[in-house]
Amino acid sequence: MKRKINYTHIAEPTVFENVFPTYLTNETMMARKQKVLQRMETEKFDQLVFYADKEHGSNFEYLTGFIPRFEEGLLVLNKDGAATLILGNENLKLCQHARISADLIHYPAFSLPNQPMAGEQKLSQIFETLLDETAQKIGIVGWKMFTTQQLSLIHI
């Protein structure tokens, strides 16, 4: 069955020239972190784990100022404000440019395929060192769909 397609001319969008970007100040970034920490206290979260990839990075970026490009990443935020970034090879350099102070853990499995995997450890081992044993409530922000074959990789 053939369908007739009608094209319509519409007005070009308005172009705003000489508009300068708004840069987020350190004060703004710290205020964001404080808002999250206050909400954690209100909701009684001891820790939050933020998942990010190129398509799902806004929550992570809200605090760190960047989205892990090409890869995945995690941000673990403790109720005392301490933060840890878990990043693959391509993003290791971004920790020093993050807008919040954070420790860095290299997790090669978050790297692109065929990258060096030296020092690889299980994510569950990383969490054993990071997650507070006395924590009563740990939240997860973001998501990743795992297939049944990949479920065996997760021991959280």
Locate the predicted segments by residue.
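A composition/biophysics-driven feature that prefers long, compositionally simple stretches
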Residues: 1-155
